[in-house]
Regions:
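Active/ligand-binding-proximal structured segments within catalytic/core domains
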Residues: 152-178
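Low-complexity, Gly/Ser/Thr/Pro-rich intrinsically disordered linker/tail segments
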Residues: 426-524
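Mid-domain, small-residue-enriched loop/turn segments at the edges of structured enzyme/sensor domains
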Residues: 201-204, 235-276
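Conserved small/polar residues in nucleotide/adenosyl-binding loops
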Residues: 218, 521-528
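Long, well-ordered, tryptophan-enriched scaffold segments
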Residues: 1-4, 26-27
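A penicillin-recognizing enzyme superfamily signal
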Residues: 22-64, 70-121, 125-133, 138-143, ...
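Extracytoplasmic
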Residues: 15-17, 124-127, 168-169, 185, ...
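Conserved catalytic neighborhood of penicillin-recognizing serine enzymes
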Residues: 183-239, 299-326, 330-331
């Protein structure tokens, strides 16, 4: 603060003398606090963990410090298992476990140092939540954890804790750059099939493979294979650069790999920065630095700091790109992995779910035309979770309440957005009487495009063949006309995908009917000679 030393500014802020105009909305904060505290919003119930510290004076006078971390290490080693956890069903069980640990580490002649024991019991799983007005970057509410606070200015999981963002990062590091600068559209397809790069094999959460799949569907259903292949196409460096530009300060060069598209990061990200990134998409592609105050005034009313004049703003993706991503994420809410978070009421909602390996982290990131909200949930010690739906529960109940008195509206469509009919299996223009004759039903559908990106080529993943019903093979020149039918096949599908059973393989294409190998006239003439 201008004119203040660091110590003077600290005292003025926390002990009086300065007026801080906060961006917090007390009503929204109250709603967040109430819903985070409501145990009914947590699927698997509540457990309890703790922060522990105590000192032991050993027989020879040496002082040793023990913590919850040393406790974890001690029992994992003692039990020869990595599954030991300090998450218990009650506070009483926590205290009993601590007492047993103290007993186990105290040797003969050792003593617990008086007044050295510190125990703080906390609920698990923990959560972090941030609600931001995307048009300004102003934080309206923030929750740094659940349970009673140990004191003022304690650890805030929303601003200080870095955790893996999981599939919420697919939008940030893959699909935003793919649509914005990678030459992709929502209709662009990848073959969702078994996929290995080097010694790394990628899989989908469902362990199934859908074949040729559009980016829109991959966002809606959170399909990993399509995401990784898309980033491979556009280049890891492009994905990394876009993620950085979205405001993430914890990325490192070790994150320059395909894993960034799935949210597999070296350090992870904070809930606050993830909220700001999604807020940029909600704000027509313009990033606003998160702010907790607008102005700081001295006791005479003089403006010492004016955040509205100094906050960082930049366009991170085109307005058209932001709208296209938003439209795909609307599908997430109504027919995809985010249906549980959808609160209805006619208010437009867009979002993306996320989980990490063994469900250690669960997230939901989403927005309306008014607010952006991101919820993270997980155990402080990174334990495996048995349920991951509660971030969606929290997002739904909080966002429904804070929008109760707001006018329902949709996201405004930019003038540069157009529509075109394409084939779902190629992302290209459909071939007449081919793509709509797919054995599973028509594959033609209407998609949105940024101006200038509508495909001009025809589908290259469907083919129409004349098939002999007698042999089931490609009809030859001697097959009777009344036994020949026209069928549509997929071409280029990989083995193991849902498309493969409808695929005309190279072997199939190169083989023709072996029943009608010669003409009927030639056969009758041969019989007459005999």
């Amino acid at each position: 603060i201008k004119g203040y030393s660091e110590s003077e500014a600290y005292k003025a802020i926390y002990q009086g003398g300065l007026t801080i105009k906060s961006t917090q909305n007390l009503q929204i904060q109250k709603i967040c606090d109430e819903e985070v505290a409501d145990k009914a919003n947590y699927d698997a119930g509540t457990k309890y963990s703790f922060y522990l510290s105590f000192q032991v004076k050993e027989k020879d006078g040496t002082i040793k410090t023990y913590t919850n971390q040393t406790m974890l290490s001690y029992y994992k080693k003692k039990n020869k298992s990595q599954n030991y956890s300090i998450n218990f069903t009650s506070e009483e069980d926590c205290r009993a476990a601590i007492a047993q640990y103290e007993k186990d580490v105290l040797g003969k002649g050792d003593k617990l140092v008086e007044n050295s024991e510190y125990i703080f019991i906390t609920m698990q799983p923990q959560v972090a939540m941030t609600i931001m007005d995307q048009s300004t970057g102003e934080v309206r509410a923030i929750v740094g954890g659940r349970g009673n606070k140990a004191g003022n200015r304690t650890w805030n999981r929303a601003t200080k804790t870095c955790r893996q963002p999981g599939s919420t990062f697919k939008i940030i590091a893959c699909y935003a750059p793919a649509l914005d600068a990678g030459g992709k559209t929502l209709a662009s397809v990848q073959d969702d099939a078994p996929f290995t790069v080097g010694n790394k094999t990628y899989n989908n959460y469902s362990h199934t493979f859908g074949g040729f799949t559009s980016i829109r569907k991959a966002i809606t259903k959170s399909i990993n294979i399509v995401t990784v292949k898309t980033l491979q196409d556009i280049g890891v460096d492009l994905g990394y650069e876009y993620a950085e530009n979205f405001g993430f300060s914890t990325l490192t060069d070790t994150d320059r790999n395909l894993g960034i598209s799935l949210g597999g990061l070296t350090q992870g990200v904070t809930n606050l920065e993830l909220t700001a990134a999604y807020a940029a998409i909600a704000n027509q592609g313009e990033y606003n630095e998160p702010s907790f105050y607008t102005q700081v005034l001295d006791h005479d009313g003089n403006v010492l700091l004016d955040k509205t004049q100094t906050k960082e703003q930049r366009q991170v993706i085109k307005e058209d790109t932001a709208w296209l991503l938003t439209d795909a994420m609307k599908d997430v809410m109504t027919s995809g992995t985010g249906m549980r978070a959808y609160f209805g009421t006619g208010m437009a909602q867009a979002g993306k779910s996320g989980t990490t390996t063994l469900n250690r982290d669960a997230l939901f990131a989403g927005f309306t035309p008014y607010y952006t909200c991101v919820v993270w949930g997980g155990y402080d010690d990174n334990s495996i979770q048995s349920a991951t739906g509660y971030p969606k529960n929290l997002w739904k109940v909080v966002m429904k309440r804070i929008h109760a008195d707001l006018k329902a509206k949709d996201f405004e469509k930019p003038s540069g957005i157009t529509q075109a009919v394409v084939c779902a299996k190629s992302g290209l223009l459909p071939e007449a009487d081919v793509c709509d004759k797919d054995p599973r039903g028509t594959q033609s559908y209407t998609e949105y495009f940024a101006e200038g990106t509508v495909p001009t080529e025809n589908c290259d993943h469907h083919i129409s063949l004349q098939i002999c019903e007698a042999s089931g093979k490609v009809a030859g020149e001697y097959c009777p006309a009344d036994q020949v039918v026209t069928k549509t096949y997929i071409v280029g599908a990989e083995k193991g995908s849902a498309d493969y059973q409808y695929c005309a393989t190279e072997k199939f294409l190169n083989g023709t009917c072996n029943i009608h190998a010669v003409s009927y006239t030639h056969l009758r003439a041969h019989e007459t000679v005999l």
